[in-house]
Regions:
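A short acidic, glycine-rich active-site loop
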Residues: 79-92
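Small/aliphatic-rich secondary-structure junction motif
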Residues: 2, 20-77
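Gly/Ser-rich helix-loop-strand patches that form or flank binding pockets
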Residues: 1-21, 123-169
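A short helix-to-beta-strand connector/capping loop
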Residues: 101-109
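Conserved beta-strand positions in the Rossmann-like core of class I SAM-dependent methyltransferases
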Residues: 60, 109, 164
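Charged docking surfaces used in two-component/phosphorelay signaling
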Residues: 112-120
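Short glycine/serine/threonine/alanine-rich loop segments
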Residues: 51, 57-58, 106, 130, ...
Length: 169
């Protein structure tokens, strides 16, 4: 801990350091990479796989299904069919990614998330003891980013572990 903080922290036992704890050499043991199966997430998947391989880390490949905007107009049967189709497609795509990771000697698992992506990613990372979150980003700025929101910026702001954002081309 920096020497400057010691007198401050010692004067009030309720105060906590704002400097995140660092591990020697910062070796990652559990890496979570989130994908939405778009081109923006491909470079993040590649980088996460590379880091997992280098660190002999476990790779958690996560996907969060988002509900369709027309949800209020769907019948219960239509919603159930849509949800089942989305889950099946995600399982197939993540299954292929897991096979690729295992071919490269990386222990990989699927992590199915539900709810808003940023909330689900942060919560899963905390519950599972993730050392690093890797996210793809589209690189939009200004008004475009404001309109669309940014899962990556929300995760960066709220995660308790390091977050690596990988910009797509």
């Amino acid at each position: 801990m920096p020497e400057v903080l010691n007198p401050i922290l010692e004067s009030d036992p309720k105060m906590q350091p704002v400097v995140p704890a660092q591990r020697p050499g910062q070796i990652y043991r559990r890496i979570l990479v989130a994908t939405d199966f778009t081109a923006a997430s491909t470079p993040a998947l590649k980088q996460a796989l590379k880091l997992a391989k280098q660190n002999h880390a476990e790779l958690l490949i996560a996907h969060s299904s988002t509900e369709p905007a027309s949800l209020s107009f769907m019948s219960a049967d239509s919603y159930d069919a849509w949800e089942k189709q989305c889950r099946t497609e995600a399982e197939q795509k993540i299954g292929a990614l897991i096979q690729q990771a295992r071919k490269e000697g990386v222990k990989a698992h699927m992590l199915e998330l539900s709810g808003l992506a940023d909330d689900a990613i942060v919560e899963a990372a905390e519950q599972l003891g993730v050392d690093l979150i890797v996210l793809g980003t589209h690189g939009r700025r200004g008004f475009s980013r404001f309109l669309l929101g940014s899962v990556a910026s929300q995760v960066v702001a709220r995660a308790r572990c390091p977050v690596l954002t990988v910009r797509s081309s």
